[in-house]
Amino acid sequence: MDKLKIAEWGEKLKTGGAQMSRMVSEKVKDMLQAPTLESKMVDEATLETLEEPNWGMNMRICAQINNDEFNGTEIVRAIKRKISGKSPVSQRLSLELLEACAMNCEKVFSEVASEKVLDEMVWLIKNGEADSENRKRAFQLIRAWGQSQDLTYLPVFHQTYMSLEGENGLHARGEENSMPGQSSLESLMQRPVPVPPPGSYPVPNQEQALGDDDGLDYNFGNLSIKDKKEQIEITRNSLELLSSMLNTEGKPNHTEDDLTVSLMEKCKQSQPLIQMIIESTTDDEGVLFEALHLNDELQQVLSSYKKPDETEKKASIVEQESSGSKDTGPKPTEQEEQEPVKKTGADDDKKHSEASGSSNKTVKEEKQAVKIELGLSSDEDEK
């Protein structure tokens, strides 16, 4: 009997436990592998001591991926390890970092599909002991990616979403019903703009929030001082990163960079929110001072961003005017153009005749000189 049980257990390990064995081997391999610069950056961006995502760090990671300074595969692998970890804080921050990289880096979606990050997210969703907010957040991302028409070239996203929808339809409907009542800083940032920021994928929840809310005053005035401080911190991180990119030497076309444009749009969206904080804050002078100072910095950076384009337009206008002034002089008529040609021909003929005459005269003089030297008389010459 013991041998039969051992044989049965062996068969179970070969079939049902094959996937678990691969997961264990991958985790052991990751543990034995030396930490890379990419993994260190992900560790720093997903520290358990962070209460909110470090958007400055997240955007810096995206910029370094786009500049090929970081290996996108290593970043995705490090995020995958954090999602499969046990820390709810690290899981939440990893999901936010994953979304930021996917929105701002073209190649990240392919890495997410090839590194089987979706499997870890599905495991997180189905894990009843995991944090409920993290499970919802993972499902939101899979749903948005699965419904996106831009990701049809990667069928794994749609297949994973449909698999979850079929297995747990009640969970999906329950979440859709619960989402409209929630109000987050991310949804508030999207309200002033009728379209999602460039480079982002369509998120149904954001579109629904845009349709239900008419302005910024809906729930923004009820934000606590803590929420206002968080909004100020998020905006400041984006502004600092944008300022550093605009002031980077050796990049004359930085205004055309996709990440720069995305950060600029985020700062534009944040400016009315900061102004609302200024108007609604009456009980905390510290928050009011920070909001006023940040608003001044936003206006300065936004105005400096527009200057290169205006300078280029003025330069092109001046160049057109200068080129136009050169061509405004009167053009010679066809008759005037032909007259110099005729005159030149006449002058050439005259010069030719003079040259021939002078040459004949020179020949005669030479003959006369020869005769004188020989002592020939003029009479003999006449004979």
UniProtKB/Swiss-Prot annotation:
Ubiquitously expressed. CDD domains: GAT_GGA-like_plant (cd14231), VHS (cd03561). Residues 223-310 form the GAT domain. It is found in: Cytoplasm; Membrane. It is a peripheral membrane protein. GO terms for cellular component: cytoplasm; membrane. Gene3D superfamilies: 1.20.58.160, 1.25.40.90. GO terms for molecular function: phosphatidylinositol binding; ubiquitin binding. The modification Phosphoserine is found at S377, S378. Residues 305-383 are annotated as: Disordered. GO terms for biological process: protein transport to vacuole involved in ubiquitin-dependent protein catabolic process via the multivesicular body sorting pathway. Binds ubiquitin in vitro. Might contribute to the loading of the ESCRT machinery. Belongs to the TOM1 family. This is TOM1-like protein 2. The lineage of its organism: Eukaryota, Viridiplantae, Streptophyta, Embryophyta, Tracheophyta.
